Amino acid sequence: MVCLKTLSVFLAAFAVADARAVFKTQSNKNGEMIADNYIVVMKDGVSHDDFKAHVSSVASIHTTNKAKRGTNTAGMKREFDIMNWRGYHGHFDRDTLEEILNDSKVSYVEQDQVVRISGLTTQRSAPSWGLGRVSHRRAGSRDYVFDDSAGRGVTIYGVDTGIDIRHQDFGGRARWGTNTADRDNADRHGHGTHTASTFAGTAFGIAKNANIVAVKVLGSDGSGSTSGIIAGINYCVQDAQQRGILGKAAMNLSLGGGFSQANNDAVTRAQNAGIFVAVAAGNDNRDARAYSPASAPAVCTVASSTIQDSKSSFSNWGSIVDIYAPGSDIIAARPGGGSQSMSGTSMASPHVAGMGAYLIGMGADPRRVCDQLKQLSTPAISNPGSGTTNRLLYNGSGQ
């Protein structure tokens, strides 16, 4: 079950006043906390000007406390504004945190945590079976049957380890977006290139005509932070808004960490803004409600299936899962050229992101796509898991 605990009106070390913002902490073993790093979320209705005034005040308070006590905290790091859901990430000492919590404009404060990819690399070459499976009611076909519009006019944001945008599988349809993880824009891991190839590659992908945007939020070791993920989501929404493609966009997040209300709130705002959001359920063979962003009810949470139409042994499960998609031994592009096989709910999620773009390209509303995918799905999973839906992704090809 969800393990986020609200400490009512108390910090762990000292009592606080009744009017203070809520301090949320993770008491579950899924969360790997980042010391003295916090995500601060403002109350709904706080104006842009009031938000900027608050940020300026916090920066000043931090500078004063740092000089007074000699702490080595970095202070304000980045701001978020996702369709008026406003907040920021910072590295603060306890005294500055106290001041933040006492501000009536703050809704809640959450400690930042590590987020990791949800994929496992296996051998470098394997038969590709996922495309055939999602375009046929029955297992066994290697043919991918699809409408040739294939996501044309739709943009998919790959929020991941980066993407090799020059890979031949993308046919010039991929562009660079932003990097909230490090100073190296290359995909040194391979995970992001693989997932992008799955959702929109020419050879390996579902939506073969969709545009692709690389949003790097994880480093070469496949890890990042909740604050970095939110910054990436913030970029996606603002980019889509500026380009006038809200309603013609999708987002894939093949990653996860312990439960985070801030992470869930961010993806919910993106989904409600008109970007279809697909997320990996996670790879711990546990209830996905304990993970974020998988536990956000508004997004499409994806579990992994095998070529035998069974639940992948590693896949998370539970009532929050919306749909299964192929995730074991999936072959797709690797950085620098060529291909490789990977397994994980990371590989299942981009099948759904690509299928979402496929439907959006045919006129579907991104806010209704997950429900439409569930209606189209095939009840084929032999052991979906306790309380988990028996729905396998299908594109409605008639095969």
Curated annotation (Swiss-Prot):
Residues 1-19 form the signal peptide. Disulfide bonds: none annotated. Residues 38-117 form the Inhibitor I9 domain. InterPro entries: PCSK9_ProteinaseK-like (IPR034193), Peptidase_S8/S53_dom (IPR000209), Peptidase_S8/S53_dom_sf (IPR036852), Peptidase_S8_Ser-AS (IPR023828), Peptidase_S8_subtilisin-like (IPR050131), Peptidase_S8_subtilisin-rel (IPR015500), S8pro/Inhibitor_I9 (IPR010259), S8pro/Inhibitor_I9_sf (IPR037045). Pfam families: Inhibitor_I9, Peptidase_S8. Glycans are attached at N252, N395. Residues 380-392 have a biased composition (Polar residues). It is an enzyme of class 3 (hydrolase). Residues 380-399 are annotated as: Disordered. It is found in: Secreted. CDD domains: Peptidases_S8_PCSK9_ProteinaseK_like. PROSITE patterns: SUBTILASE (PS51892), SUBTILASE_SER (PS00138). GO terms for cellular component: extracellular region. Residues 128-399 form the Peptidase S8 domain. Keywords: Glycoprotein, Hydrolase, Protease, Secreted, Serine protease, Signal, Virulence, Zymogen. PANTHER family: CEREVISIN-RELATED, PEPTIDASE S8. Secreted subtilisin-like serine protease with keratinolytic activity that contributes to pathogenicity. This is Subtilisin-like protease 4. It comes from Arthroderma gypseum (strain ATCC MYA-4604 / CBS 118893). The lineage of its organism: Eukaryota, Fungi, Dikarya, Ascomycota, Pezizomycotina.
